[in-house]
Amino acid sequence: MAKSKIRVRYAPSPTGHLHIGNARTALFNYLFARHNKGKFILRIEDTDLKRNVKDGEKSQMDNLTWLGIDWDEGPDKGGDFGPYRQSERKSIYDPLIQQLIDEGKAYESYMTEDELSAQREAQKARKEMPHYVYEFAGMTEDEKQAKIAAAKAAGIQPVIRFHVPENTTYAWDDMVKGKVSFESKTVGGDFVIKKRDGMPTYNFAVVVDDHMMEISHVFRGDDHVANTPKQLMIYEAFGWQPPKFGHMSLIINTETGKKLSKRDETVLQFIEQYRELGYLPEAMLNFIILLGWSPVGESELFSKREFIKMYDEKRLSKSPAAFDGKKLEWVNNQYIKKADENEVFAMSIRQLIKAGRLPQRPDMSQIEWTRTLVSLFKNQMSYTGQIVDLADLFFNGPADINDEAKAELDNDTALPVLKEFRQRIEDIDVFEATAIQKTIKSIQKDTKIKGRALYMPIRIAVSHEMHGPELPETIELLGRETTKKHLDAMIAELAK
């Protein structure tokens, strides 16, 4: 197919926030379209009215935009193939369903949910795979019409079922998995294409929409493989050419070794959650691309532009993709390190305000102090939300000192160093890191105490920690009075 004819889509249901797996589906379709100079379409599959949530569509769009994924056609942009919400396309679906009924390829089914449930339970008891059994089997036409009349009189709304062809093989050359085939007898019998509420089912609407919107390629999750033979049956019934299919591997939680599930609470799974924690969109996009796709070479960090240029669907993996939270933190840390200082500052100060560490409207002195604070911890943060805990010393004072730190002060030089430093910081004119460093160096020159023996007692005294950011900068941010307070407390403790 010519590149100019390439049209792909991402078609979420507005039933909640953007999930990692769905974000990957959107991203791989987006990259395929952009690499091949094709079109990327956003379509909203909102036919499951009971499961749709308020603002679900908006949430999907907001998070896609945040990730840097834009679309050429969609409910907000329009296009030549709209409407782009399935709930607005009923007038397109209904005549096509009627066409199938008229051609004997679909029919009204009046079995109630209780009857269907009883049928499934009986099949399970016989150790059979649950499947729909034609409800009018063995009936004469008069008996069939009598049953339908009784159902209508009882107020039962029918569903429309598609008549599954017997003894037929449905196969396709999957762009990821290779050759895949299903026997028609394995799909669970005649399946519903129109629900009792009058809305089409997913498997019917998706075929109609993909055909009408001239979708050329469909990249989606491996969990859709079982839907594909049903969809191929509908394509065949209408005499339409199906698109090329590619089913991407499952995403596995490395902590549990199981498929990433929305019920899995061991890992955050929604893009919104990572936004709130302070992950960078470029880092999230980079990480998600690596879930089932690999670039040539050893490097893993690329810009969106670079990914678009190098993207090759043949490098999609057949093996499950491992969702590794530690890897995500590493990727995001790399992006934070090279990110614009102002961007990281803006994200970090929002986190501090949200946590109540700063007022809703900080004054200029608080803003400048926070700017220095963020620069101090910038390279340590895996995500900007960590600034709240990393900087806890500056808001809540030192945590309890541990035994290892106490042992570090159990020597003959710790107390003299602290006393000297406490005395000399009184003489610092401008209390900033450069002057503080000179003061520490002057103690080294005068006492001959240096290295760990010099710096560690001061660090432990002011922070109760053995490790942390640059000591002079830490002391500058604490301020002269707070530093004196911490030093006095430790000197008193060691003098006992």
Curated annotation (Swiss-Prot):
Pfam families xrefs: Anticodon_2, tRNA-synt_1c
Motif segment ('KMSKS' region): 259-263
Gene3D superfamilies: 1.10.10.350, HUPs
InterPro entries membership: aa-tRNA-synth_I_cd-bd, aa-tRNA-synth_I_codon-bd_sub2, aa-tRNA-synth_I_CS, aa_tRNA-synth_I_cd-bd_sf, Glu-tRNA-ligase_bac/mito, Glu/Gln-tRNA-synth, Glu/Gln-tRNA-synth_Ib_cat-dom, GluQ/Sye
Recorded coiled-coil stretches: none
Transmembrane feature ranges: none
Location of the protein in the cell: Cytoplasm
Residue numbers binding ATP: 262
Keyword Protein biosynthesis carried by entry: yes
GO BP field: glutamyl-tRNA aminoacylation
The EC number(s) this enzyme carries: 6.1.1.17
Role noted for this protein: Catalyzes the attachment of glutamate to tRNA(Glu) in a two-step reaction: glutamate is first activated by ATP to form Glu-AMP and then transferred to the acceptor end of tRNA(Glu).
Family note: Belongs to the class-I aminoacyl-tRNA synthetase family. Glutamate--tRNA ligase type 1 subfamily.
The protein's name in its UniProt record: Glutamate--tRNA ligase
Lineage: Bacteria, Bacillati, Bacillota, Bacilli, Lactobacillales
